[in-house]
């Protein structure tokens, strides 16, 4: 699934928006003009059991007779306390936690496949099978070519050019995915969750149909995630999406990647590192809309230096297949020929088609995202939703947070709202990006007066490798309170470094706290605690749209 600013939770559709790595996503919150029923958190009729008793006995909770939202009497007894449709990150987390709290839980999921469809999926969901994990494995594979180049300056010589075998990588990747989906199945089994293979569809507020068999449940959770979206242009049948790109039979010789978001940049880095010729076509002037402006500029420059060709302000219009099998991409500025593959990384859509949600009254946005309140409850009181299907912040750790919060809300008598403040994120481009907190533009708008610290330097490794690699780091600080509002980095190990600093930003530490921290030398990370002089001071009232910049010498250059 982001700018990752803190969303202000609201129950109106006019609430502030949040960018989700590339794309601008509105929080899908229910309109006050048609409010849902108030939450009643005493969902279970028995007294709360102690953790020790729950670990020994799986209890079947009996719900009192209730009037369902469609006016029909709900059944007195249910097959399950929770029935989850979709065994991705959020669904598995919610189901496992709910079961640990003593609820009877079932999960349905489609049969395993590396490529998703209306009839295939797999336990583990997008992240494990078609996203984070396989993508990161391919990133690892692609980085070796750059490391071979770096090693020459350190005295390494190769009598024979290292050879890469695509089929070996894909076979080993798929074996790892099979192992991981098995682990997820065991997690559910060990938690006492019933796993049902098949396609689930909501029949009424308390009934799910799985391939013709009906199951009743006190609560239903929708966690079906999203699917890649390819625009409908002439020749789109020749295009591939991110699912297919992770499982191609052969490595592309020359690939066009349409899109300028994090998925596009990650795959551009992968195929460039594997020695494919890579062209990236974007509609904007710069990549990564929704990210910090200086990060956008920096990563584009660095990726260009590695041989990736960017075609800016170009919109795809058609794909043409030649007699020799090669593909041509026609854009608003002309035609580029000779591609072996054309990949679209133009966003993802919630996977809500044919789930029966409209018929039971679940409200959705125009793009199919399920509208939920702050507790992940839909417009139908017994139906809930977490993860990418709600189009909030489309990140795996966020889906995990939402799933855990939902289980506490329903089954632990602990109404829990997911906390979207200062969610860290990464782009595994080459070089990679890590960020947490506000972008500079957001900080100025919200706080007015900010001090900006930046460093742009050649890392120690590059001084001997001879390659043009650089690192960019940025701190955004509230001038009045000295609180660190945002932290951004592009360079080797940025995601690993930012994960640690995310704790500091989340905890509300100040620039003085950073300054008082002893750095680890020699590292790139130490720059975050050694920047002393602001690159610029921005002085502006939050309510005014104007800002004055006091430019000073850049720190760390």
Swiss-Prot record:
Catalytic activity: 2 glutathione + NADP(+) = glutathione disulfide + NADPH + H(+)
Protein name, as recorded: Glutathione reductase, chloroplastic
Record's compositionally biased regions (Basic and acidic residues): 545-557
Organism of derivation: Nicotiana tabacum
Cofactor notes: Binds 1 FAD per subunit.
Taxonomic placement: Eukaryota, Viridiplantae, Streptophyta, Embryophyta, Tracheophyta
Quaternary state and interactors: Homodimer.
Keyword Transit peptide recorded: yes
EC number: 1.8.1.7
Annotated gene: GOR
Pfam families, sorted: Pyr_redox_2 (PF07992), Pyr_redox_dim (PF02852)
């Amino acid at each position: 699934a982001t700018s990752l600013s803190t969303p202000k939770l609201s129950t109106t559709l006019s609430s502030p928006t949040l960018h989700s790595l590339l794309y601008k996503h509105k929080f899908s919150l229910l309109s006050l003009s048609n409010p849902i029923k108030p939450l009643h958190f005493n969902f279970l009729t028995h007294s709360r059991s102690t953790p020790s008793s729950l670990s020994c006995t799986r209890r079947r909770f009996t719900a009192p007779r209730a009037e369902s939202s469609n006016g029909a009497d709900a059944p007195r007894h249910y097959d399950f306390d929770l029935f989850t449709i979709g065994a991705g990150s959020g669904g598995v987390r919610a189901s496992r936690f709910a079961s640990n709290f003593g609820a009877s839980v079932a999960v349905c999921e489609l049969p395993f496949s590396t490529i998703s469809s209306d009839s295939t999926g797999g336990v583990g969901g997008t992240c494990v099978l078609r996203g984070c994990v396989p993508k990161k494995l391919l990133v690892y594979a692609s980085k070796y070519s750059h490391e071979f180049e770096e090693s020459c300056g350190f005295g390494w010589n190769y009598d024979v050019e290292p050879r890469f075998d695509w089929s070996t990588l894909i076979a080993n990747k798929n074996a790892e995915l099979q192992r991981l989906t098995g682990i997820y199945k065991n997690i559910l089994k060990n938690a006492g969750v019933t796993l049902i293979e098949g396609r689930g569809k909501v029949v009424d507020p308390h009934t799910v149909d799985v391939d013709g068999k009906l199951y009743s449940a006190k609560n239903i959770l929708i966690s079906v995630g999203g699917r890649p979206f390819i625009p409908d242009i002439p020749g789109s049948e020749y295009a591939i999406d991110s699912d297919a790109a992770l499982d191609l039979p052969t490595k592309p010789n020359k690939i066009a990647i349409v899109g300028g978001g994090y998925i596009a940049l990650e795959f551009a880095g992968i195929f460039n590192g594997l020695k494919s010729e890579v062209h990236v076509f974007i509609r904007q002037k710069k990549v990564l809309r929704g990210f910090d402006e200086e990060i956008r500029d920096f990563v584009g420059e660095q990726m260009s230096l590695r041989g990736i060709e960017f075609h800016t302000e170009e919109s795809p219009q058609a794909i043409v297949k030649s007699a020799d099998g090669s593909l041509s991409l026609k854009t608003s500025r002309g035609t580029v020929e000779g591609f072996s593959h054309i990949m679209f990384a133009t966003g993802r859509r919630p996977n809500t088609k044919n789930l029966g949600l409209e018929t039971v009254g679940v409200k959705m946005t125009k793009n199919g995202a399920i509208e939920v309140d702050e507790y992940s409850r839909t417009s139908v009181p017994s139906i809930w939703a977490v993860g990418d299907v709600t189009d909030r912040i489309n990140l795996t750790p966020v889906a995990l947070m939402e799933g855990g919060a939902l289980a506490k809300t329903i089954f632990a008598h602990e109404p829990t709202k997911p906390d979207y403040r200062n969610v860290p994120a990464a782009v595994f481009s080459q070089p990679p990006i890590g960020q947490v907190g506000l972008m500079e533009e957001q900080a100025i708008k919200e706080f007015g007066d900010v001090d900006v610290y930046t460093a742009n330097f050649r890392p120690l490794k590059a001084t001997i490798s001879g390659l043009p690699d650089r690192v960019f780091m940025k701190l955004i600080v509230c001038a009045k309170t000295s609180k660190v509002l945002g932290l951004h980095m592009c360079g080797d190990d940025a995601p690993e470094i930012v994960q640690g600093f995310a704790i500091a930003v989340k905890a509300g530490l100040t620039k003085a706290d950073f300054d008082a921290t002893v750095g680890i030398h020699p590292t790139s990370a130490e720059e975050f605690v050694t920047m002393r002089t602001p690159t610029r001071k921005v002085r502006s009232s939050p309510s005014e749209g104007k800002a004055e910049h006091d430019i000073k010498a850049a720190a760390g250059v």
